[in-house]
Amino acid sequence: MRIHFVGIGGIGMSSLALHSRLIGEDVYGSDIYESEQTEILRKLGVKIFIGHNYNNWLYPDIVVHTPAVHSDNPEIIRARSNGIRVVSRFEFLYDILNNGKTQFAVTGSDGKTTTTAMLAHCLKVLGEDPTVFLGGIHRSLEFGNYRPGKGPYVYELDESQPEFSRFSPDYMIITNARGDHLENYSGDRQLYRDCFRSVVMSTRKSVVTFSEDENTSDLGTWTFGKSINSTCRLIDRNRNGLFQFAKIEINGKEYNLTLKVPGEHNILNAMAVITLLWSAGHEVEEVLKALEDFTGTYRRFTVTVIDEKRKVYMIDDYAHTPDEIKSLLSTTREVFPSQKRVVIFQPHRYSRLMREDGNFAKALKDADEIYITEVYSAFEQTIPQISSKVIADGLVSYGKKAQYVADADLLIENFQLQENTIYLFVGAGDIIRISQKFAKMHAKK
């Protein structure tokens, strides 16, 4: 079968393209720019067109598209005019999974990628040989966001579209549900919650939910969190640099958890994985042992030393919701308690900025100095009356040193590095380009 992927370089799409290529399908596709993922695919013999064009056409049997691609895309138009089946990446993933293998899914607003990576790591260590579809990059996976295997499927189930509700995993973790993509549910919170309820009802064996999440805590077979009623409860947590140690209780029995990744949110992510694998019949002690060797996911608290002597560091992080930013700043304070924190934040999507209103300023006010760049639209239509300047204005009203910057490149070119300072580059767009430029300009050899 010949498969055309429209938006082939995206994290979610490239994992599907990798899977298809490695099982012997004829794969090609298009994207608007080159990336590490397109380079990997090319090395496997995948033809990739840069730019979307009516002539990007090799007579496919099926066309798969990312949610960022709309019906006016010329390749979609040509496919439909020729009677070629056009499906979303959700539909395509659903078809891949529908072959009788055991399925482990992770969904929710925050922490999906790290939790999925933890789950995949543990199943690999436990000898399950999983096939993994990840919504980020983890270096332990053969292709970063994809791992071929003969065992169960492990996948990140993106809740941004109502289509996720049709999936039927055997085991599922819901990290939380905050309505981060409510615009895709017509702003209807009840519809959003009903979609979570639907996928829970379709889950064949067990569902693990966060006991403190008001939208989904009651949907789980088992729960994790700080609540006394949690199946897996956090009793105590200590830390030493990037390492942390927790005492947890599962079904009345206490255990010790050690992680090499910082932040209470990662302890909770690990607890979700422990609870799910315990429900699937794995020994808790074996899961705890596997988690000791887990390393962080790319762009999740990625630390770079800029100038060790002057104690200047850079953190690159994908955080793009207010809750994720709060966790990031809290973790930074834990790991680097004496350093000043300077944040360069790129808001992601106009709809999110509009929906969250003043929540970004509230989340960012824990930083010492904040620079807000222009919104990364992520293929959304520009909303002229919405500007990221509103975040900077909100921070100034809190008495913070904050500034809106139209040109992030110019900002870092003129930065005078301050000693004993952490520079945090935060967002889900192309802020990584700015962080990489910053590191190249300022890092001491």
Swiss-Prot record:
| Catalytic activity from the UniProt record | UDP-N-acetyl-alpha-D-muramate + L-alanine + ATP = UDP-N-acetyl-alpha-D-muramoyl-L-alanine + ADP + phosphate + H(+)
**Pathway linked to the protein:** Cell wall biogenesis; peptidoglycan biosynthesis
E.C. designation(s): 6.3.2.8
The UniProt keywords, alphabetically, are: ATP-binding, Cell cycle, Cell division, Cell shape, Cell wall biogenesis/degradation, Cytoplasm, Ligase, Nucleotide-binding, Peptidoglycan synthesis
One Pfam family from the record:
Mur_ligase_C
Does the record's keyword annotation contain Cell cycle? yes
Mind telling me which GO cellular component terms the entry cites?
A: cytoplasm
Per UniProt, what is one GO molecular function of this protein?
ATP binding
Which GO BP terms sit in this record? cell division; cell wall organization; peptidoglycan biosynthetic process; regulation of cell shape
Q: Where in the cell is it found?
A: Cytoplasm
The first-level EC class reads ligase
Task: Tell me which InterPro entries the record gives.
Answer: Mur-like_cat_sf, Mur_ligase_C, Mur_ligase_C_dom_sf, Mur_ligase_cen, Mur_ligase_N, MurCDEF_pg_biosynth, UDP-N-AcMur_Ala_ligase_MurC
Q: For binding ATP, which residues are annotated in this chain's numbering?
A: 108-114
Q: What does this protein do?
A: Cell wall formation.
Q: Which NCBIfam families match?
A: murC (TIGR01082)
The UniProt entry's sequence similarity note says: Belongs to the MurCDEF family.
Name recorded for this polypeptide: UDP-N-acetylmuramate--L-alanine ligase
Q: Which organism is it from?
A: Pseudothermotoga lettingae (strain ATCC BAA-301 / DSM 14385 / NBRC 107922 / TMO)
